Regions:
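Conserved acidic carboxylate
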Residues: 18
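Active-site beta3 strand of CheY-like receiver
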Residues: 56-62, 67
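The feature encodes the CheY-like receiver
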Residues: 68, 86, 98
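Hydrophobic/aromatic residues positioned on beta-strands within the core alpha/beta folds
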Residues: 91-93
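Two-component/phosphorelay signaling modules centered on CheY-like receiver
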Residues: 21-40
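Short hydrophobic/Thr-rich beta-strand motif most characteristic of the beta2 strand and flanking loop
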Residues: 35-44, 48-50, 114
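Non-catalytic signal-transmission and effector/linker regions of two-component phosphorelay proteins
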Residues: 1-15, 28, 57, 121-140
Length: 140
């Protein structure tokens, strides 16, 4: 699969923040299958600190919008104001209504949007596009 996507994923790292076990499993398995270094967080607590401590720094953060103690918009604000995390791509991942959430995510400064449920067949290509600098704003 890696060869067909024409990208060496092994040089990239990602952080996925997702409170749903099923969604987390799909994201984690897909990133690891591609060869990416993957870190997972299920609550949203300490995301900025975790991202800052990652070695290497994450290239992309997949961030759920609805988390138990906070939301993706609040976490994004913290990421965007952190000097050490400047330039990290942040992609919203949510099951919320795309027609409502995509404009909000764009306005908030997300680098992309992937709707749930995550498609196992499309997710690797979405990751490739994101890491190549192409915005992804897709409902699934």
């Amino acid at each position: 699969m890696v060869g067909t996507l024409d990208m060496d994923f092994t040089k990239y790292s990602a952080l996925a923040v997702e409170d749903d076990a099923g969604g987390m499993a799909i994201i984690g398995v897909m990133m690891r299958y591609l060869g990416m270094q993957a870190y997972l967080n299920t609550t949203g607590d300490g995301v900025v600190e975790l991202a800052r401590a990652m070695k290497p720094r994450p290239d992309v953060i997949f961030l759920d919008i609805n988390l138990p103690k906070t939301n993706g918009y609040e976490i994004l604000k913290k990421i965007r104001t952190d000097e050490k995390l400047k330039g990290v791509l942040v992609v919203a991942v949510t099951a919320q209504d795309a027609d409502t959430e995509i404009p909000k995510c764009m306005a908030a400064g997300f680098d992309g949007f992937i709707g749930k449920p995550i498609s196992r067949s499309r997710f690797p290509r979405q990751i490739r596009r994101i890491l190549s600098g192409e915005p992804v704003w897709e409902t699934y």
